[in-house]
Structure formats: C-alpha cells, structure tokens
C-alpha cells in the first residue's frame, strides 16, 4: 500500500494480507493495528507519537522525523530500523538474531534523538549489526563502552 504525500491524519483498518506499508509524508499521529504478515513500514515525516505492537514478520521499520518518545519491542525478524530525528530517550533491547544467515547485515539508524541509555546487549552484538547513535546525549560511561567495542 503506497499512500505517501496525501496529508492523511488517520488510516483505516489495514488488510490482513498487507506486506508493504508506505505512508511517508502525511500527518499521521498514530498507526492502526498492524497486520501479522507486514514486512515493511515506511512512516517517515509524520507526527507519530507512538507505535502499535510490531508484527513478528517485520523486516524494515522506518519512522524518521516523527515525535516518538518510546519504541515497542522489536521483532527478531527486523533487519533495518531508522528512528532518526525523534524524541526517543532510550531504545528497547535489540533482537538477538539466531535464525538468519551470517550474511544478513543488520542496520539500525538512531541519530538525532535524546537517547541517554542503550540496552546492554548493544555492547555485545554481532559485527554484522551496525547501530548509528550520532547526535544523542549518551552518558560518558556509555560512550566509553562503545568506543572500547569499536577499538
């Protein structure tokens, strides 16, 4: 479903068979309940303040430039996350990937938020996982731990 650039403030109930949702550049403050088979969400450039529970099949979630202060639990299937330019103060635990091939790269972009705390498991993630935390007020203890991980 592609409903970009429509100035939508609400969405109707979504079809159960929906796998791809692109609602970039609207005026949404919330998303409806998400279908269980959904694999891709792009809801950048809206006014979202919260997200519903994420489906276990979700692989890509992009919600840049919204007003999110909290993220729900992230599904293990997630391969790409972009929550840049929101109001997040923390991140949920990053899913441990034990069922994907070693070639699968995981990319989480969390720039320009208010993140001061990160989940402990970020410090022990697989090298195929990239997490970008630029422009966040991370504590000096966390910055030191992260720099030791990349050294």
Regions found by a protein language model. Give the residues of each.
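Leucine-rich repeat
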Residues: 14-19, 27, 34-39, 47, ...
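Leucine-rich repeat domain C-terminal region
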Residues: 82-85, 93-151
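Intrinsic-disorder/low-complexity detector
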Residues: 4, 9, 13, 19-20, ...
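Canonical leucine-rich repeat
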Residues: 11-14, 31-34, 51-54, 71-74, ...
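Conserved hydrophobic beta-strand positions in leucine-rich repeat
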Residues: 1-3, 21-23, 41-43, 61-63, ...
């Amino acid at each position: 479903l592609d409903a970009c650039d429509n100035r939508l403030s609400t969405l109707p109930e979504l079809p159960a068979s929906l796998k791809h949702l692109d609602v970039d550049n609207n005026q949404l403050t919330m998303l409806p309940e998400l279908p269980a088979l959904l694999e891709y969400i792009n809801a950048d450039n809206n006014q979202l303040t919260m997200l519903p529970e994420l489906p276990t099949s979700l692989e890509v979630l992009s919600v840049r430039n919204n007003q999110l202060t909290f993220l729900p639990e992230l599904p293990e299937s997630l391969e790409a996350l972009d929550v840049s330019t929101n109001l997040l103060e923390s991140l949920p635990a990053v899913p441990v990937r034990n069922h994907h091939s070693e070639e699968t790269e995981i990319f989480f972009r969390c720039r320009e938020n208010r993140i001061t705390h990160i989940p402990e498991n970020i410090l022990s993630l697989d090298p195929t996982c990239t997490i970008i935390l630029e422009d966040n007020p991370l504590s000096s203890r966390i910055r030191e731990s992260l720099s030791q991980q990349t050294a």
